[in-house]
C-alpha cells in the first residue's frame, strides 16, 4: 500500500509538471468572473443526480461503500475525468462499516431509539438507573449500576466516554437522552477505544429522557433494549482531481464528503458541498491558473472523517508542505440557513487555526460584504474534514449553513427564516433530499467557493509560507479541541456533532 501511495504522488506531480504549460493559452481565472459562471440550474441538476442514486436502491441513502455511494464516487470521477483538465484518481482504502437494528421498550411501551455507530449488540431487560451529572467521570455512576441500563444526559464528553464508563460501572447498556429538542444520532468514533470496552449504547430524545426520569423517580422502571449490530470491512474511495496547469508546489485544496448517514440521501449533508465543488471545478476548466487547484471528495466522513484522515496521513511531509491551504464545504444549503464562516482567527471561539486560517476567514468575510450579505462565525473545533489538515499545520477555512441547532432571533433578523426552528430540520434524517435545499444559500455559497478558488489560484501572497514557525503543534491543538465547549451556537453539524455532546 505504501508503494501504491508513492506511485500516486509521483505520477500526480509529474503529470502536473508535464502538462502544466499546455493550458497557458487560456485566460487567467479571475475572482470577479468565475463566480458569475456558477448557475443554480447546474447545482440543482447535480444534486438531483445524487438523490436519484440514493432512491434507485431500497436503502435510499448514500452510506459509504453502498451501491448509491459507489455511484456517487464513479459519477464524480467520470465528470472530472472527461474534462481533460484534471489529473484524476480514486484513492482506495478499507474501513469498517456498521449498521444496526434496534428496539426499546420501557414498562411495555415502545420508544424511538437510535443505535450509536459502533455500538455492540445487546438484548437486555433490566431496570433503568439515572447517572448523575453528565456521566463524564466515574464518580457520576451509581455504585449499584451492575446489570442495569444507564440513563445519561448528553453533554460535555464524547459518547464513547459515556459508553466506556457505563461498561466499567457494570451496566448492561446505556441510553443517552438529548439535551435539545428532537431525536439524536451519534457515533462512538471507532470500532474500539483506548479508553476501554464499550457498553451497548443508543440515543433517545430529550422529551423521552425527561419522561423516563420522572417514571424512575416514581418507582422501579424496567426497560428492554435490543440492538443487532452488523459490522463488515468495505473498500471505498476518495476522488482527487488536480489541475494539470498551475504550480504543483503551491496547491490550493478544497473538499467535501461524498457519503450520507443511513437515514437518508444526504442532499444537503453533504451533497450540497460536493456538487458545488464539482460545478466550480467544471467552470474552472475555461481558465488557466497560476497555482494548482486540487478538488478532494472524501469518503466515509460520517463514520469518523475516515477518508480525509486517510488521505492526509498518506502524504509525506514534502507533499503536505505543497498544500498551502484547505477549504471545507459541508452543508452549504440548509433550508433555514445562516451564512457561517469558520473562525480561523479564533476571535469568536478562542481556537485559532494554523497561520493563514485568519486570512481565509477574512477573504470570505470580504466576499459576503461585497455582495451585501451578513455572516456570522462558526466554531472551528476540527471535527469536520478539515481536522486532519489543521492537525498537520495546514491553514483551513470554509463555509457552513447549520445543522440541528435552533435558529436564534438574532439570526432570523440577519438571514430571514424562522427563529426557534432548526437550521436544518432534516439533518441526518430521511427528509434530507432535494426539497431540503435552500436555493438562495446554495447559489450564494457556491459563488463564494468560486471566488475563493479564483483568488487563491491567482495568488497565495496573503497566506504565510509553510514552515516550522507557522505550524500549530498537534498536541496543543488536540488539547484545545478537547477543551472547547460544544454549545450549539455555531450550528454544529455533521460528524463533529455525532461524537460528543
Swiss-Prot record:
Active site: 301 (proton acceptor)
Keyword tags: Aminopeptidase, Glycoprotein, Hydrolase, Metal-binding, Metalloprotease, Protease, Secreted, Signal, Virulence, Zinc
One Pfam family it belongs to: PA
Molecular function terms from GO: aminopeptidase activity; metal ion binding; metalloexopeptidase activity
InterPro entries linked: M28_fam, M28_SGAP-like, PA_dom_sf, PA_domain, Peptidase_M28
Glycosylation sites: 123, 233, 316, 350, 433, 467
Region Disordered, residue ranges: 480-501
Signal peptide (residue range): 1-18
Record's cofactor remark: Binds 2 Zn(2+) ions per subunit.
Any GO BP annotation: proteolysis
Gene3D superfamilies in UniProt: 3.50.30.30, Zn peptidases
Function noted in UniProt: Extracellular aminopeptidase that releases a wide variety of amino acids from natural peptides and contributes to pathogenicity.
Family recorded in the similarity comment: Belongs to the peptidase M28 family. M28A subfamily.
Name the record gives this protein: Probable leucine aminopeptidase 2
